[in-house]
A protein has these predicted regions:
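Extended, helix-rich structural scaffolds rather than catalytic motifs
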Residues: 1-48, 52-53, 257-391
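Alpha-helical bundle segments that constitute or directly flank the non-heme di-iron/ferroxidase center
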Residues: 28, 93-125, 188-219, 273, ...
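Conserved alpha-helical segments that form or flank metal/cofactor-binding pockets of metalloenzymes
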Residues: 30-81, 142-165, 244-246
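Acidic/His metal-coordination segments adjacent to aromatic residues that form catalytic metal sites
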Residues: 82-103, 164-200, 218-220, 268-289
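Long, hydrophobic, well-ordered secondary-structure blocks that form the structural core
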Residues: 102-178
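Inter-helical turn/loop segments and adjacent helix faces that build the functional surface
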Residues: 120-132, 154-159, 187-189, 211-231, ...
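Intrinsically disordered, low-complexity terminal tails and linkers in eukaryotic proteins, enriched
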Residues: 358-430, 448-517
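Cys/His-rich microdomains that often coordinate metals
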Residues: 409, 439, 443
């Protein structure tokens, strides 16, 4: 009997998950728990039972590595094939590359901020399961940045504007919009970070970024971007599920958490909606072949899906964000307003802009029947006519930035698309400017945080955006040229009008060589 082998019982998913998460924790003995976890109480959130945190996927680290390894093998096979077969010549039009440049300059670095945020949040949560979830999401986001870098690096061999990403991220005026979003989240408490990224961005808004943009990449022949997008999308689906579980966990722990969470939902929904105005511009103006308009994407992914979400959360006492109605009204306007801003400041951006064709204007008229022909088409046609006469419009002045979202004041008043929205607050004898009531309210709640905002335009005026050795008092000093050199732009190659650009000429020549003798 002693020699009989006992069949080893195979653990179920639930038992295995418990061993690989809660089983990894321990109670500190030589330090009080409050000293080990000093940041999980000061935000006012009350947690009574960390064991209520459950990952709906019950994913353990060993299973995680197996899934991600399989996805990486497939992804890198496609990237290699794309590079070896000159896949960059299969895209519809070199104008499409400007959308990828903006994604690379402004979205990919944000992934690195989220890596840092989840690593920090995981360190400061007491529950073992929440720490494991944060660790996996931090690794996910790091992997997303790396796969984006490896996919997009192929374009950097042939086209302008893909270089110096890390340098530009810390300096270029329009990149301060995603950068300030990431730094605001990164410097918040661990629970606010969770609501900012896991819930407000990942659950409520992420589909507005990834689904239409990756569909647009497929429609425009960019299989490299499609593949890293789809590889990340399965992670995003998991992040979304964790996001809804995270907010429910906080709301179920204590009724006192509800007003705190509601304020964070108000803030981060609005900050995310403002940030995604860049995506709206990409969808409506920068994709030569368009899948859907920004307005249609907003109606599907924000109004329908988000509306159902907030109806579900009503039983916890959570209402739709304060800026919901204004953001829904803005779906008619923001993509046009942001495109016109970048068109006129195209000399100061590291990607190209252009005048839409007649077909593209007609498409916009169809998609925005209530607003485009009335408010935006006349202005675009006016600028196009000036360009045809050799008078391409470039703004050489600097715009006023919103202190909170850092977007130039280009958005209009709710209910009046003919009037620029402008708000002011005086705090400690200094005046601060905002693009909306909601950005002003965010500032009012955390003024000491936002008075420290590094606003690029203000820094330029203060003389802090010139390379060492530049003499602003020299007779031939050109301040705009000096600032663009500080940004490390290759002037005349990275920026300006698309028609006649080096990217346009090279793409046409290389594709001609690839398709005929």
């Amino acid at each position: 009997m002693m020699d009989m082998k006992v069949a080893k019982k195979k653990l179920g998913i639930k038992e295995r998950y418990a061993h690989m998460t809660r089983g990894l924790g321990w109670e500190p003995t030589y330090q009080p728990a409050d000293a080990v976890f000093p940041y999980d109480k000061y935000e006012g959130i009350k947690i009574h039972d960390w064991d209520k945190w459950v990952d709906p996927f019950r994913l353990t680290m060993d299973a995680y590595w197996k899934y991600q390894g399989e996805k990486d093998r497939k992804l890198y096979a496609v990237i290699e094939a794309f590079a070896q077969n000159n896949g960059h010549l299969n895209i519809t039009d070199a104008r499409y590359l400007s959308a990828i440049k903006l994604f690379w300059q402004g979205v990919s670095p944000l992934e690195n901020y989220v890596v840092q945020g989840f690593a920090r949040a995981g360190r400061h949560f007491r529950g073992e399961a929440s720490r494991v979830a944060c660790q996996m999401q931090a690794v996910d986001e790091l992997r997303h940045y790396q796969t984006q870098a490896h996919s997009i690096s192929n374009y950097n061999k042939y086209y302008n504007g893909f270089h110096s990403q890390r340098h530009m991220w810390d300096r270029v005026w329009y990149l301060s919009v995603p950068k300030s979003f990431g730094e605001d989240a990164l410097t918040s408490g661990p629970f606010e970070f969770l609501i900012a990224i896991s819930f407000s961005f990942e659950y409520v808004l992420t589909n507005l970024l990834f689904v239409p943009f990756m569909s647009g990449a497929a429609y425009n022949g960019d299989m490299s971007t499609v593949t890293f997008g789809f590889s990340a999308q399965s992670d995003e689906s998991r992040h979304m599920t964790l996001g809804i579980e995270a907010i429910k966990f906080l709301l179920e722990q204590d009724p006192a958490n509800v007003p705190i969470v509601q304020r964070w939902v108000d803030k981060w929904f609005w900050r995310g909606a403002r940030l995604l105005s860049l995506v709206g511009m990409m969808m409506d103006y920068m994709l030569p072949k368009r899948v859907m308009s920004w307005k249609e994407a907003w109606e599907i992914y924000a109004e329908e899906n988000g509306g159902a979400l907030f109806r579900d959360l009503a039983r916890y006492g959570i209402r739709p964000p304060k800026g919901w109605a204004d953001a829904c009204e803005a779906k008619e306007h923001i993509s046009h307003q942001v495109w016109l801003l970048f068109y006129e400041y195209g000399g100061a951006a590291a990607f190209h802009t252009w005048s839409p064709t007649d077909d593209e204007l007609d498409w916009l008229s169809t998609k925005y029947p209530n607003t485009f022909d009335k408010y935006y088409r006349p202005r675009i046609e006016f600028l196009r006519e000036k360009h045809a006469r050799g008078e391409r419009v470039y703004q050489t002045t600097l715009p006023t930035l919103c202190t909170t979202c850092q977007i130039p004041l280009a958005f209009t008043e709710p209910g009046d698309p003919t009037k620029i929205s402008h708000r002011e607050t005086v705090y400690k004898d200094e005046k601060y400017v905002f693009c909306s009531d909601h950005c002003q309210e965010i500032f009012a709640h955390e003024p000491e945080k936002f008075v420290q905002s590094w606003l690029p335009v203000n820094q330029i005026y203060q003389g802090n955006c010139f390379n060492p050795g530049v003499d602003p008092t020299a007779p031939d000093f050109d301040p705009l040229k000096a600032v663009l050199e500080y940004f490390r732009f290759n002037l005349g190659r990275d920026n300006g009008e698309f028609d006649g650009s080096e990217d346009q000429r090279n793409f046409a020549a290389w594709r001609g060589q690839a398709s005929k003798n």
